[in-house]
Amino acid sequence: MTLCFCGWLLGQTSTPMVTIKGGSYVPLYGVKGENKATKPVNVKSFQLDIYPVTNAQYKAFLEKHPEWRRSRVKGIFAQKSYLSHWKSDLEFSPLEAQAPVTHISWFAAKKYCECEGKRLPTTDEWEYVAQADAQNIDARKKKHYQEYIVRSMQTPKTYLQKVGNTPKNYWGVYDMHGLVWEWVADFNSVLLSGDSRKDKQGDDALFCGGSALNASDLTNYGAFMRYALRGSLKANYTMLNMGFRCAL
């Protein structure tokens, strides 16, 4: 596990990153093998921001890329609610400077990461990191992990808290749970549609009304919620509790 501070301690805007060693995990939904069990997915080593992107960092991006300010961004790239919690194009409450930026579309998050020389993490990368607690790479079946996920989802207005507010996990990554939902690069690879599901193996990865029976872990409440949310999104959607972080 390697820390890459990327100028954070020098007052620059890039978030520190950690190297996530590659491995495999069993996704909540995936392709079934001959024994009807969900096949593990291999995840290659990559780097991930230890925090979600903050309001202050996103403001610095907008200063360099004015076409993404809320008064100028095109509707095809972001809904009218884009950055609606800010007072103006470049102004927000000083108390929110280190809170995660929200009301951000997938297009905007993708562009920010590209301008940082990074990218959005894939669903598999994000879920691979999110399954860890402080001591274990995969803590999904542990009672304390499940209770923490449910408790964090019941806490209101977590998007107002500063990044780094939650304990870091095994990889040294903060806020994977308990702060905001996060965009991933391939969010629309999971569909929320009962009508679109066809009777073939490849569609086992689709999330639909009755697909809980095809899930690999019925106790993973947090993953159910994330898959359902991703399946309902469009790339220009913005939400009060939806932020992002970058990968490399």
Question: Positions of the model-derived regions?
Answer:
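Acidic helix-start/capping segments at beta-turn-to-alpha-helix junctions
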Residues: 71-85, 127-130
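Bacterial N-terminal signal peptides
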Residues: 1-7
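A generic structural motif
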Residues: 28-30, 186, 247
